[in-house]
């Protein structure tokens, strides 16, 4: 948790300097502060886009593997090197500066813009649900852009349609209560093959999950979704 409070204040300060109204939201001593930012559109006040980012980073150890101090932000060529440069401070500052440039150029934004910048993403966002419940109205929006993005080999932005989840499962198969000689393989079943058969019931050769009910809550792509995907280069 080193530097969490200081970093949240710094991010809020950067937002304000960029013309974005900002405040620090809190839940208590055991939760990292959340930085909130907002710009209201004059011409399109009924549509809101929210950017999600985080200001916390992974630990810097082992330090001896770094060529330069991890928080030096050293620039080599046109790239910044340092802890959090790509996860997730680089993306965050890019979005902030994009909004700042738009405001300076046009004096307005194309729709309401909101920023939700948390400080616990790297340890599982353990309090984000509490923040969402407490500040539901403040965080309301029509669409969310997640924390990062990619470009392809031709430097074209890649549009992601979602994020995968994580599921940890431990499978245990048992047969003999003690270690036995391989010569008994014809009469004592090998539990490893039980695991192989179990795994084979979970997913087919094309990657489709075979577990009953797995896709029940998945919304199918609409015709418009498919048309947009087909138009992508």
Stretches found by the model and what they are:
Residues 158-174:
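Flexible glycine/proline-rich, aromatic-decorated loop/lid segments
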Residues 36, 114, 168-172:
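Beta-strand secondary-structure signal
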Residues 53-55, 77, 119-120, 147-149, ...:
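Fold-independent oxyanion-binding glycine-rich loops
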Residues 86-162:
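Acidic/histidine-rich catalytic neighborhood of metal-dependent amide-processing enzymes
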Residues 81-82, 177-182:
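Short small-residue beta-strand/loop micro-motif enriched in glycine and branched aliphatics
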């Amino acid at each position: 948790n080193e530097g969490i409070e200081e970093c949240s204040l710094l991010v809020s300060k950067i937002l304000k300097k960029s013309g974005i109204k900002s405040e620090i939201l809190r839940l208590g001593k055991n939760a990292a502060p959340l930085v909130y930012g907002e710009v209201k559109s004059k011409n399109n006040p009924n549509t809101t886009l929210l950017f999600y980012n985080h200001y916390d980073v992974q630990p810097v150890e082992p330090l001896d593997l770094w060529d330069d101090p991890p928080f030096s932000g050293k620039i080599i060529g046109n790239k910044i090197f340092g802890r959090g440069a790509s996860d997730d401070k680089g993306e965050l500052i890019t979005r902030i500066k994009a909004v700042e440039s738009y405001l300076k150029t046009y004096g307005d934004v194309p729709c309401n813009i909101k920023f939700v910048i948390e400080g616990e993403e790297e340890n599982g966002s353990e309090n984000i649900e509490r923040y969402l419940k407490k500040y539901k109205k403040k965080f309301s929006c029509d669409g969310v852009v997640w924390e990062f993005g990619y470009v392809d080999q031709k430097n074209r932005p890649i549009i992601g349609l979602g994020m995968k989840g994580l599921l940890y499962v431990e499978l245990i198969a048992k047969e003999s209560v003690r270690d036995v000689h391989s010569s008994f393989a014809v009469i004592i079943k090998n539990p490893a093959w039980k695991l192989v058969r179990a795994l084979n019931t979970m997913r087919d050769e094309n990657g489709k999950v075979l577990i009953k009910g797995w896709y029940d809550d998945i919304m199918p792509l609409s015709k418009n979704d498919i048309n947009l995907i087909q138009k992508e280069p």
